[in-house]
Amino acid sequence: MMSYLKQPPYAVNGLSLTTSGMDLLHPSVGYPATPRKQRRERTTFTRAQLDVLEALFAKTRYPDIFMREEVALKINLPESRVQVWFKNRRAKCRQQQQQQQNGGQNKVRPSKKKPSPAREVSSESGTSGQFSPPCSTSVPVISSSTAPVSIWSPASISPLSDPLSTSSSCMQRSYPMTYTQASGYSQGYAGSTSYFGGMDCGSYLTPMHHQLSGAGATLSPMGTNAVTSHLNQSPAALSSQAYGASSLGFNSTADCLDYKDQTASWKLNFNADCLDYKDQTSSWKFQVL
């Protein structure tokens, strides 16, 4: 029973953690007690001491050592306390001056801010006065912009209302530049334009220029029964016109057009090999190969 009581309470790996054991493990390490930092006592000045110090501070903010010692003897305080008081008093004085300057600036700033809205209002009124004439002049601008609409509106309506007249006028304007017998040619195609009411005939009639190679691609999708039915009636107007090889300005170098005037017969051979155009005894015939 006594041996149980004498057994050390903490045993780690067979080593008893006692004070003697710690001393054996760390003989060179000392554990000195941490010295408590002595706090300097706060000096409390009486009213009489403050009056003496304030009187000296009013004379000079930076007293020399002799003046500080003299005041320290008067108020029964060490000279270091007097020196610290002057240091703190100068800092307080600077802080007060800074606050006064900031307060003065804060007072001046609202006075600056108050007229600034008035200036802004005056500037806004000035700008509104400057911009008000453009607002008044903008009405004639709108009227002038509406005027071209009223002028151009008949022109925009007329092509929609009468597409045949515009297409025929385009033909009459375009073909006299290339063909010598333009009047008869335009009259001959005037009848065909009535059958192409909703289409742009200029794109399909321009193959009569020297560029007929691209016309085969444009005319090839037109090999339909509806187009043939319309074209079967149009050669009467074309056959009534007399065309000579010398009257039409076709170049003999055009590989895509073979024009022959044999018993008033027309023959157009395209490279696309999709259209065989023959006019024999006033008959039109389209053969889609």
Swiss-Prot record:
Family note: Belongs to the paired homeobox family. Bicoid subfamily.
CDD domains xref list: homeodomain
Gene3D superfamilies the UniProt entry points to: Homeodomain-like
UniProt subcellular location: Nucleus
Protein name: Homeobox protein OTX2
Annotated InterPro entries: HD, Homeobox_CS, Homeodomain-like_sf, Otx2_TF, Otx_TF, Otx_TF_C
Region (Disordered) location: 93-137
Native organism: Xenopus tropicalis (Western clawed frog)
Location of the DNA-binding region in this protein: 38-97
Compositionally biased intervals (Polar residues): 123-137
Cleaved signal peptide residues: none
Alphabetical list of Pfam families matching this protein: Homeodomain (PF00046), TF_Otx (PF03529)
Marked site: Determines DNA-binding specificity: K87
